[in-house]
A protein has these predicted regions:
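C-lobe/activation-segment region of protein kinase-like
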Residues: 147-195
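Protein kinase catalytic-loop region centered on the HRD/HxD motif
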Residues: 117-127
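AlphaC helix of the protein kinase catalytic domain
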Residues: 93-103
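A short, aromatic-enriched beta-strand patch in the conserved N-lobe beta-sheet
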Residues: 73-75
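Activation segment signature within eukaryotic-like protein kinase domains
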Residues: 111-112
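AlphaC helix of the eukaryotic protein kinase fold
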Residues: 43-62
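ATP-binding glycine-rich phosphate-binding loop
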Residues: 2-29
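Conserved short submotifs of the Hanks-type protein kinase catalytic core
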Residues: 78-93
Length: 262
């Protein structure tokens, strides 16, 4: 990179995000961290792959969602060729957190809300994207929000039903991996994950909206169960307090009436 000393510095390859045709880097541009995506050297000189990368830029540049990493530019860089430039994400990938068994209740909640929201947005924009996997999901250091770092390489007027079913299957597979390392059992979420990954596509959720409704019902049920548990606990506590108080009243001597006092 001829401009490395002035414009670009501290270029670092990110092998965990390597794709079939592309490499991903973290680099400083004028002192600010960004991420680059470029074709591998063996594909960089081929027009068909250049067109593929440019089309991905065109598709992703128009995406604007809080849980999808924003694209900033499409630029030629010496030694790398044309590159897609995106915001840098400070944080850990979901894969890293799964491997470390560091899945918090807060993150589990984000996976039930933010991730389906992002998938719904992608489908609404008719984006055919790469299979969803934990490596593509970043958890930000600040806010602990979810960010999809790599979506979109084709755009159609309509999506096939299979595209939606594949998204649902991959979501369920990710949810299963998360639940395996989560400290407590989540039977209702496990049921949702099992339905997402049912071998028979006809038995899965038909679309992301149906999936989101199932998750919302699960959350509502959890709230109701918590309320019921609280009421039962309070009833037991009140019964116990009454049982403690009753013997004291029984053992107290009878107070004389006014007539007896006379």
């Amino acid at each position: 990179m001829a401009e490395q000393d002035s414009k670009w510095s501290e270029l670092t390859l990110l092998p965990e995000w390597e794709e079939e045709f592309c490499c991903v880097y973290r680099v400083k541009k004028y002192g600010k961290w960004v991420m680059l995506k470029s074709l591998k050297p063996e594909y960089a000189g081929k027009l068909e792959f250049q067109s593929m990368l440019e089309k991905e830029f065109d598709v992703r540049y128009n995406l604007a969602h809080p849980n999808i990493v924003m694209i900033n530019d499409y630029e030629y860089i010496d030694g790398l060729g044309q590159c897609i430039i995106t915001d840098n994400v400070y944080g850990s990938s979901l894969r890293e957190l799964i491997n470390k068994k560091e899945i918090s209740p807060e993150l589990l909640l984000r996976l039930q809300t933010q991730l389906p929201d992002a998938l719904a947005y992608i489908q609404e924009n008719h984006i055919v994207h790469r299979p969803l996997r934990p490596e593509m999901i970043m958890i930000t250091e600040e806010g602990k929000n979810i960010k999809l770092i790599d979506v979109g390489f084709d755009q159609r007027n309509t999506l096939k039903a299979q595209d939606c079913l594949d998204d649902i299957y991959n979501y369920g597979d990710i949810l299963k991996q998360v639940l395996e390392v989560f400290p407590s059992k989540q039977p209702l979420l496990k049921h949702i994950a099992d339905k997402c990954t049912d071998p028979n596509p006809k038995h899965r959720f038909h679309d992301v909206q149906e999936l989101r409704l199932a998750i919302e019902r699960r959350s509502s049920n959890a709230i109701y169960l918590s309320i019921i548990a609280f009421i039962v606990a309070m009833s037991i506590l009140l019964a116990w307090l009454n049982s403690r108080r009753s013997p004291e009243h029984k053992n107290q001597p009878n107070q004389p009436t006014i007539e007896q006092a006379k």
